[in-house]
Amino acid sequence: MDIAKIMGYLPHRYPFLLVDRILELTSEEIVGLKNVTINEPFFQGHFPGEPIMPGVLIIEALAQTGGVLAFTLVSDFRGKPIYFMGMDKVRFRKPVRPGDQLILKLKILKRRGPTFKMSAEAFVEEQLVAEAELLATIGAAKSEREA
């Protein structure tokens, strides 16, 4: 799935869209890609002279990739937000630097209606750099919330 299709699912835009491509997608799993470049705005201050992608943004990239998976499983997702509800078992294993390709792998552990619990792992060159369990839910469309 290319960036145009991803943007059809996610409301995020530059500089906060953190998934560039979907490499694999099934009804239970997704694999995404984030090309990490020196042009990322966060590298200006994190850290000058030794740029490292902030761990919370690795988690956000995982969450966005999981959002694409969730939205593909809901037929009437248009106009509905996805809310990040929580994270557990978060671990950062290695730094992510400019030039890295971040591979984002998520698998549904549990689904109850519009709520999803997913295992999430991020890799660089087949080495685990971060992992977590993420919880998210698809909310009501704005028109439904205003009614």
Swiss-Prot record:
Highest taxon, organism lineage: Bacteria
What Pfam families does the record tag this protein with? FabA (PF07977)
The membrane spanning regions, by residue number, are none
- Which BP terms from GO are recorded? fatty acid biosynthetic process; lipid A biosynthetic process
Q: Where in the cell is it found?
A: Cytoplasm
What's its top-level EC category?
lyase
What coarse category fits the chief subcellular location reported for this protein? cytoplasm
UniProt KW Lipid biosynthesis keyword: yes
Q: Which GO terms describe its molecular function?
A: (3R)-hydroxyacyl-[acyl-carrier-protein] dehydratase activity
Q: This protein is called what?
A: 3-hydroxyacyl-[acyl-carrier-protein] dehydratase FabZ
Q: What organism is the protein native to? A: Syntrophobacter fumaroxidans (strain DSM 10017 / MPOB)
Q: What is the lineage of its organism?
A: Bacteria, Pseudomonadati, Thermodesulfobacteriota, Syntrophobacteria, Syntrophobacterales
